[in-house]
Amino acid sequence: MIWSVDRRLHSRALADLDAQVIRLTKHQQSVAGTVADISKAGVCLILPCELRPGELVRLEVADSRLFGYVAYSTWKRQAFRTGVEVERVLLGGSDLAQLLQSALQDTMPAVLSR
């Protein structure tokens, strides 16, 4: 489910979407998390572990992929609140991907459908 909210520098769409985060290192470790919000600057994730600022990651949400790098990762309320600046988006064809596309429509760079 996605709700609109306006705060900070960019307006945000609140979200509650399952995501898989893959570290784009030689070991390509992955961790499950939740997309908490989406904005022009990127996405905010709730994760069980810390990611390093500057680390390259791939996010898998439904059948869509978002590529970017970690902007911050801070401990808050029993989890790490992690910001990812998104550089590229590849959208899938599922209903959830269409919902994601509507949230990303005017905020993300290079949104592509598969």
What is each of the regions a protein language model found here?
Residues 24-26, 40-41, 73-78:
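Short, conserved beta-turn/loop elements at beta-strand boundaries and strand-helix junctions
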Residues 50, 63-66:
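Short, charged beta-turn/beta-strand-edge "cap" motif at the junction between a beta-strand
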Residues 43-47, 76-87:
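Short, solvent-exposed secondary-structure boundary/capping segments
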Residues 31-33, 67-73:
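Short beta-strand-centered aromatic/proline hotspots
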Residues 1-38, 88-114:
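N-terminal helix initiation/capping motif
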Residues 10-11, 46-50, 73:
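Short, surface-exposed secondary-structure edge patches
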